[in-house]
């Protein structure tokens, strides 16, 4: 599913968190949004997901105007996301968190699973193994380490079988091994799944993204391939430095 934003402006009083930002992510593209702290990256994801209403501008998902739609309607269109802050059910086990996400996708709550309970259990097991967290299945989410929680959050977003996935700093706080595991998981996603990732881990961005959008103080300052962005003098000045 393609997604686009045109002329997005978000004002909080006199502050413009976004100022006429355009974004185009083609269906199946892996795109990253980078920039310094306070650049407006998370605000951009929040507007695309429907968490914030733009002061000006519009959002389209799969060619449809999604600007007036609440988050749950956008999710029904196939949009999934993760957040900077944890959204796990800490008292439930890792497996139960994933099971709940799968049931939500099927709009079945806890009471009904289309087909059989075996079907649910099999899908949960597949997703645990795909995320490399099968050994944590019975552990309460509240007892996970920070990196383990981040990995589970990615798996919860994927359990919704999204057509487009918004990821907000999925590498934050991960160990080297966890980082490689998450990067491999994202690389293995079906090509038809669109990925838009906000991330400070520049090495991960350049390893994953086909296109990169750079924000600074709410303004888009660059947009292009990783090679083009790395060579951009303005991006070097405000963000990449000597990388």
Question: What do these predicted regions represent?
Answer:
Residues 2-243:
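Glycine-rich phosphate-binding loops of nucleotide-dependent enzymes
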């Amino acid at each position: 599913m393609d997604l686009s934003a045109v002329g997005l402006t978000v004002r909080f009083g006199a502050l413009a968190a976004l100022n006429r930002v355009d974004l185009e992510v083609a269906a199946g593209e892996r795109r990253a949004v980078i920039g310094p702290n306070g650049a407006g990256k998370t605000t951009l994801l929040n507007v695309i997901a429907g968490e914030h209403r733009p002061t000006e501008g519009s959002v389209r998902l799969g060619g449809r105007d999604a600007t007036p739609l609440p988050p749950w309607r956008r999710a029904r269109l196939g949009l999934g996301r993760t957040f900077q802050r944890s959204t796990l059910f800490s008292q439930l086990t890792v497996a139960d968190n994933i099971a709940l996400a799968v049931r939500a996708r099927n709009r079945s709550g806890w009471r009904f699973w289309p087909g059989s309970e075996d079907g649910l259990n099999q899908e949960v097991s597949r997703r645990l193994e795909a995320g490399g967290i099968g050994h944590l299945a019975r552990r309460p989410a509240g007892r996970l380490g920070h990196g383990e929680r981040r990995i589970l959050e990615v798996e919860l977003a994927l359990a919704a079988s999204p057509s487009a996935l918004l990821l907000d700093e999925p590498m934050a706080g991960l160990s080297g091994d966890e980082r490689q595991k998450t990067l491999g998981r994202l690389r293995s996603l079906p090509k038809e799944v669109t990925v838009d990732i906000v991330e400070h881990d520049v090495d991960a961005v350049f390893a994953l993204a086909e296109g990169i959008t750079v924000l600074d103080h709410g303004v888009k300052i660059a947009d292009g391939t990783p090679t083009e962005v790395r060579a951009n003098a303005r991006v070097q000045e405000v963000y990449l430095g000597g990388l």
